[in-house]
Amino acid sequence: MAKLHFRPYIPNQTVLFPQRIDENIAANDPVRIVNAVIDNLNLESFKKLYKETGRCPYHPKMMLKVIIYAYMNNIYSCRKIEKHLLRDIHYIWLAGNEHPDFITINRFRNRVKEEINNVFTQLIFVLADKGFISLDVECIDGTKIESKANKYTFVWRKTVERNRTRLMDKIRILLEQVDETIAQENSIKDTSVEFTSCRLSDIVDELKEALERQPATKDKEEKKALRKKKKQVRELEGYRDKLIEYDNHLDTLGERNSYSKTDPGATFMRMKEDAMKNGQTKPGYNLQIGTENQFITDFRLFPNPTDTLTLIPFFHSFQYRYNRLPNICVADSGYGSEENYRFMQENGIEAFIKYNYFHKEQRPRYTPNPFHAESLHYNAQEDYYVCPMGQHMNRIGTKRDKTASGYITESARYKAKRCEGCPLRGSCFKARGNRIIEVNHRLNQYKRQARERLLSEEGIKHRGRRCIEPEAVFGQMKYNMAYRRFRHVGEDKVTMDFAFFAIAFNIKKMCAKLIKEGKGLITVAKYLFMGLFITRYNWNIATCCQMHEEKVA
């Protein structure tokens, strides 16, 4: 009978010539692409973030490699990254056997929050140079992501303004009482104007000085009156502190209607993930991204719950980052406003953006309402509409409305002459008097142009691509990579965190495309990222920043 033999097992055996760590890493592992990408990026701007004195810090390239590779593998916790630096051979190789703790990793992320955007921009230039993207087509969409803040830490603008108004009334009443008792002639004569915290502090100081100047007395009634005066001054001090609190709330709110006490950068908005089905608002951010070939080409956070007001600032961000605007923009109906259409037309951007009711118009059974203003016949030369009964509706004026962004829309108003006794009045309209319609001719023109583009062959292609561009990125981000909630407090730190995620997402997507094409990652890494062209890209970045600073100046 043959004797059973096992392979030698000596876990404590020493090796005379230690092997390289990466010998046990697969040739097509994405960690090699991460290493090649970061090695060939220019991180000179990171040096200004460190002090020349003190203990030598960890190399920023090593820290950047470890964090980005962790984000690629759905690891966002600094403590988990620290554990992998001791256990996982991929992290050990990237870190070069260094072992930064979780505090060091977190401090590094916070330290580079101003410079990480340049790293993202350099990566996009690399992707554009190698043909993964062109920066000509921008598919834009947004999603609401919940903040780290607690749920019930809301501060509402209307509540603050209402309570502040009530506080002003209390201050005026109290000052009138104090004026009667102390009779200050210099400071509190006029109580009709609105008080500020500084003015209220001056009044409190003057009242205290007036009380100190009063002679001491042993009379019981006078002592009682003096205690009452001091109580009124203390009450006035409490009102002053409350006024300062309300003013701080309004300063933090800015143009928003709400914010969270534990995350002042977050705004309360309704999320899609509503477990209670009651429309409860939660603190969060409106994340807007631009994609091309499922790569994230730009991103920005907004406090607006809707997407309409985010498009133009997003284009400004794109132009500041790349010193250019895209040639084509693809987006859903949430961005289809007159202001957005006009901006894109003036800047030479071909807009494949839907408007409200576009899908409804494309249904086979759709029949337009014959009494709707858009269905009425319009004579452009003489500027009048014809109602279903054939009478003219002449123009009577122009209505101007101002949007939340300050844009002014103009709507022409047309009025019928004889609606009384009309047999179609019940179907046409139900208000009293003659019918008046309001028509925005400029917006209707933009809608006609958008309809022609969307129904063209190119428009159908872009409409089909839109569903698999930003929507696919959001799906991978939330469900495949478990990035459903921000883990930092403050807009600057949240932006930093998503910048790390966007870099990791793009590298991961690039690796997936290369593997799908059958290319070996180790072979691609040898020629894909050469340090020669990085200087040109950094010059472009510096030029963008310089042009922006000159424009602001």
Identify the residue ranges that each predicted region occupies:
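Hydrophobic alpha-helical membrane-insertion signals
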Residues: 1-32
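Intrinsic-disorder/low-complexity peptide segments enriched for small residues
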Residues: 2, 14, 39-41, 62, ...
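Anion-binding and metal-coordination hotspots
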Residues: 8, 56, 67, 74-87, ...
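Secondary-structure junction/capping motif
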Residues: 20, 28-29, 59, 263, ...
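Basic, short loop/linker segments at the boundary and entry of helix-turn-helix/winged-helix-like folds
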Residues: 26-68, 441
